[in-house]
Every structure is written in structure tokens, then in C-alpha cells.
Amino acid sequence: MVTGCVDLHQSFKSADSSSVPIPPPLPSKSDGLKKKLGHSSVSTATRDMWDRLFNDGYKADVVIYTDNGSIIYAHANILGTASTVIKGMLKQAKRHGKWHTISIRGVPHDAVRVFIRFLYSSCYEKEEMNEFIMHLLLLSHAYVVPQLKRVCEWHLEHGLLTTENVVDVFQLALLCDFPRLSLISHRMIMKHFNELSATEAWTAMKKSHPFLEKEVRDSVIIEANTRKERMRKRNDQRIYSQLYEAMEALVHICRDGCKTIGPHDKDFKPNHATCNYEACKGLESLIRHFAGCKLRVPGGCVHCKRMWQLLELHSRVCAGSDQCRVPLCRNLKEKMEKQSKKDESRWKLLVKNVLGSKKIGGSPFFLPVTNC
């Protein structure tokens, strides 16, 4: 049974001239070639006639020699019309009486039969396409049959491209100028590199095309490094954003107070409004520890060291130290002048990244990003 045929004509329905014609349907978003592969407007009888002409070889005038000494009979007019390359071969072929003789070797005999049949009727069996997809792809390129080329590409993109054949397809796609197919197969190789690099196909590619194998391997390394760098930047951005929120929460606690913690002159009410700063909870615990820790001198306690760092970061981003109610803000600003250039550069970079993490808007209590 024919499972794949490509349309050669557009079908249409006759309509009553007295009736208003039905408007055509909107274009489908699905792949147009997929629709063509599923049906044909050419009648079954017509397709059968072309297949029968090929199978019976009625008044054939071409002999095609394939591997293992096998022969396929065909018609010069049909082959020459379907492929300009074969047309040129027929012009140069030796003639024995009425017979033209050409050779198509290097692929299985059955693959050549499927190829020649497609030139007649644009049809193929699904099982044959599955079995000879690689050979048909090569033949479509070698003999310039764009229609078969598109069919082969479609089938590979929609199920026939697997980890078992992707290395071979990748090489063939580059050799035969299939840019889209080479991109798709390259992506699959990148995705399954560890599995594919241990296969016989990979070893064969390394032996026959060492530069290509090295290029693919290098691209895998570059992709892995790019992915790591992207992940690192994403993590850094999350940390900078958390630090920015911590700076906002610190100003909020020291200026307005939050629930049970805040300025000494603040009157806290039991029904204090819910805090909108997510960082307040963790920062509240850190401030309480800092206030009561006997080792809170710089470097004396891990938790206190973290608090000192937050206070220094605040002093560097604070826009108004004279009115600021965050402890030690002005003192730490004066301390900056005594720091080494190396430490100063490191802090400036941190400030720039923290302030830059707030892409939209910004706090009026912090310096603008451009001043960092």
C-alpha cells in the first residue's frame, strides 16, 4: 500500500455557477509538506499507472546498473525530465541499439529502485523510506531532485533522526548542503554528546573527518562553558538582588521600625501592619544577635562579620548619611578614605552590581547607579 505521495496538482471542487462560492479556508499553521505527504490529488488510477509503467518496464529504453550486478529498466524521457543530472548522463551514455546504459552505484539496489520509482510517481512506501532514508537523501542531492530532498528532510525532522543515525546524518548534511538538517542534527549531538562520543559512528567520523570531530567537540566545550557562565551570572544576579532587598529592609527597620524592632524612640503597637519587606525577618534576627554579641568586633563572629559587611555596604550606597538613621553609616563612610585601592575597587564593583540589580526604579535613599 502506498503510504506517501506528494501532490502534483491542486485539487478543486466544481461549484454550481448560480451559487455563491464558498470562501477558501484560512492558511493552516501546520507544515504544508505534512499535508502533502498524507494524500495526493492525483487519482489512485493515475498513480498506479505510473507505478505499473515503472514495474513492467513497458517500452523501456534505459538500463540502470546497480551494485551486485543488478539491473533496473526505465524510460529516458521520464528520468531526464525528473533529473537534469540523469538527463546529462543519458546524453553521454553508450547506446546498444535502443538501450541507454547508466550506472548508479554505492547504494543498495533496493534504494535505487525506490529512488527511480519516486521519479515516476512521486510515491514511496513508508517502510522503504524508514530503511533507505540515508541513501535517498544522498541520491536526492547527487541527482538534484529537490522534491525528494524535501521529503527526506521532513521525515528526518519528524521522527527518523535518532541517536543511532544522527552522526551520519550530520556529516551527510554538511557534505550535501542541507543547512537546516545539519543544524538540527548538531543540536541533537550536543544534547547526547556523552552517549554519541562512545559509538562506532563517532569513531568513524573521527577517523575520516578529524577536523569536523574536533570542531564538534570544541563546540560542546564552548556550550558547556557558556551554560556555566550563564548560570553563574544568574546566581550572582540573585545574590545582588537579595543584597539590595536587605539594604532596603535595613533602612526600613532603622527608620520606621518593623513589628518589634526599630528606633528606640519608636512606639510599637501590637497590631503593627504586616511588613512588605521579605528580608526583614532574617535581618531582624541578625540585628538582635549583633546587638547582644560580645564578639561583635570586626572578625570576631561569623554572624557579626556579616552584619558589619551589610553596614559597610549600606554606607556606600546611602545617599544621605547626615540624616540616615542606620547605625555607623557616617563613621563607615569616613573609614572608606583609609582603605587600600584594591579593597576600594572591590567594593565599588559590588555597589555597582547591587544597585544595578534594581532594573526598574530604585530607592530614593540609595545612590543612583551612574554614581557608582
Curated annotation (Swiss-Prot):
SUPFAM superfamilies: POZ domain, TAZ domain. Keywords: Cytoplasm, Metal-binding, Ubl conjugation pathway, Zinc, Zinc-finger. Gene3D superfamilies: 1.25.40.420, Potassium Channel Kv1.1, Chain A (3.30.710.10), TAZ domain (1.20.1020.10). It comes from the Eukaryota. One of its GO terms (biological process) is response to auxin. One of its GO terms (cellular component) is cytoplasm. One of its GO terms (molecular function) is calmodulin binding. A zinc finger (TAZ-type) spans 238-330. The keyword Cytoplasm applies. Residues 60-128 form the BTB domain. Residues 341-364 are annotated as: CaM-binding. Preferentially expressed in leaves, stems and flowers. InterPro entries: BT1/2/3/4/5, BTB/POZ_dom, SKP1/BTB/POZ_sf, TAZ_dom_sf, Znf_TAZ. Pathway: Protein modification; protein ubiquitination. May act as a substrate-specific adapter of an E3 ubiquitin-protein ligase complex (CUL3-RBX1-BTB) which mediates the ubiquitination and subsequent proteasomal degradation of target proteins. Interacts with GTE11/BET10 through the BTB domain. The BTB/POZ domain mediates the interaction with some component of ubiquitin ligase complexes. This is BTB/POZ and TAZ domain-containing protein 4. It comes from Arabidopsis thaliana (Mouse-ear cress). The lineage of its organism: Eukaryota, Viridiplantae, Streptophyta, Embryophyta, Tracheophyta.
